[in-house]
């Protein structure tokens, strides 16, 4: 059984965890020009994400619920990224479940609080559990997508 974990957003990551292999990668993105002023926006490259996920042949995917803050300039990109991920999963015919970050963070990272502390704890745990991916994890800055997959494949017993 192959489980995919997705840390939603253009700065996120995704991982596929199978019994005998693991894959971790930053979210594929592209820059687009939007509107009359041609403002540059970073978007998930949905066709590439679809190809990557399809190639992993996952049994199920778990993706983190997008940021639901009060600032429009953060909510809209998060929703746009979330929609792209959903489309990629649906086109690949991968069943998915949207989960709250606390579902996996609390059991794996404990009582760590604060965004920067959580990123650091995620990176350290990811490097400890998957030393063969330490370079990629460190370069990305956290292992959230990998830890989501790890939690649902190995801890929660899915």
Positions of predicted regions on the chain:
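Phosphate- and other anionic-substrate recognition elements at nucleic-acid/protein interfaces
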Residues: 1-158
């Amino acid at each position: 059984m192959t489980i995919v974990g997705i840390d939603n957003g253009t700065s996120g990551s995704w991982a596929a965890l199978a019994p005998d292999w693991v894959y971790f990668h930053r979210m594929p993105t592209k820059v687009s020009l939007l509107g009359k002023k041609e403002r540059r926006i970073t978007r998930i490259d949905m066709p590439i994400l679809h190809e990557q996920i399809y190639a992993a042949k996952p049994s199920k995917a778990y993706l983190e619920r997008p940021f639901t803050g009060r600032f429009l300039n953060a909510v809209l990109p998060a929703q746009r990224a979330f929609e792209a991920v959903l489309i990629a999963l649906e086109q690949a015919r991968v069943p998915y479940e949207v989960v709250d970050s606390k579902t996996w963070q609390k059991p794996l990272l404990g009582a760590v609080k604060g965004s920067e502390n959580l990123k650091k704890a995620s990176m350290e745990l990811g490097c400890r559990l998957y030393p063969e991916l330490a370079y990629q994890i460190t370069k990305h800055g956290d292992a959230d997508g990998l830890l989501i997959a790890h939690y649902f494949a190995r801890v929660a017993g899915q």
